[in-house]
């Protein structure tokens, strides 16, 4: 009932759309060659998929066309607030002056706040590693599965680049955002999830590739699965000094709305042409 209610909200909160509505599925009639017989029914819903790398590249290209200067492979090593502007020093010794500074460093946000801006971070984030495994295609249907484990976490199985299946994700607390990589325990967790749901059984020998990333979650709860994936702003301002906006949290699917809200938060500092 809760799943059906959630899907009803999913179907209707976005208003009119070309995406079909969700529906109930009897597994004896569909996917009986994929799922184990202990699973008798579920629900079908529709979603969209994005190439995250391509989306970021398109945003960068669009920003360049609108006059933005993009400093690739460059690190900010110092930032000083000098009255009504910021003086920012890069690792190539270039200095940039800016009337506004926005810290959108993701999982490195407090590293920037503490070590570069040299102010005390007001917000706490939790660094959570999410890992995926990629295997040869587990089934022929062009459909993704959402599998729920006994720990109440879900794992997605998604057709990937025509010949593969993408399986993930995990949630593991880490101390640093640098160089994330999947652990053996995470591999076993994802493999067991597949073997508990699918007829086809897999092992570590079936893994052809893995990748991991870090999610900067706003720390409000003890359980990593319950920490909010939303975002909050920390606006550091003084009437006589240049503002600093730190962005905590956020996710790719709402990046545009987040960016719009950044402009609203900084509206009084942005000159109107």
Describe these PLM feature segments.
Residues 91-100, 104:
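Core beta-strand elements of the Rossmann-like FAD/NAD(P) dinucleotide-binding domain
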């Amino acid at each position: 009932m809760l799943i059906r209610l959630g899907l009803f909200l999913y179907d209707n909160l976005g208003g009119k759309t070309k995406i079909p509505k969700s529906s109930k599925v009897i597994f004896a009639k569909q996917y009986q060659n994929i799922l184990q017989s202990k699973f008798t029914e579920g629900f079908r819903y529709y979603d969209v998929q994005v190439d995250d790398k391509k989306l970021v590249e398109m945003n960068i290209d669009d920003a360049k066309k609108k006059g933005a200067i993009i400093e690739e492979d460059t690190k900010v090593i110092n930032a000083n607030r000098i009255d009504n502007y910021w003086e920012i020093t890069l690792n190539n010794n270039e200095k940039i002056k800016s009337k506004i500074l926005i810290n959108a460093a993701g999982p490195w946000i407090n590293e920037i706040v503490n070590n570069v801006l040299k102010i005390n971070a007001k917000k706490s984030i939790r660094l959570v590693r999410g890992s995926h495994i990629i295997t040869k295609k587990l089934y022929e249907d062009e459909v993704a599965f959402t599998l729920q484990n006994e720990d109440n976490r879900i794992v997605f199985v998604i057709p990937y680049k025509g010949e593969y299946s993408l399986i993930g994700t995990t949630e593991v607390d880490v101390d640093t955002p640098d160089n994330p990589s999947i652990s053996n325990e995470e591999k076993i967790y994802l493999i067991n999830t597949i073997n508990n749901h699918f007829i086809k059984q897999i092992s570590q020998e079936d893994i052809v590739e893995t990748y991991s990333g870090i999610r900067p979650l706003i720390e409000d709860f003890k359980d990593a699965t319950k920490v909010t994936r939303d975002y909050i702003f920390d606006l550091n301002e003084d009437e006589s000094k240049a503002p600093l906006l730190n962005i905590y949290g956020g996710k790719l699917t709402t990046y545009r709305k987040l960016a719009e809200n950044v402009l609203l938060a900084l509206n009084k500092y942005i000159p109107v042409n």
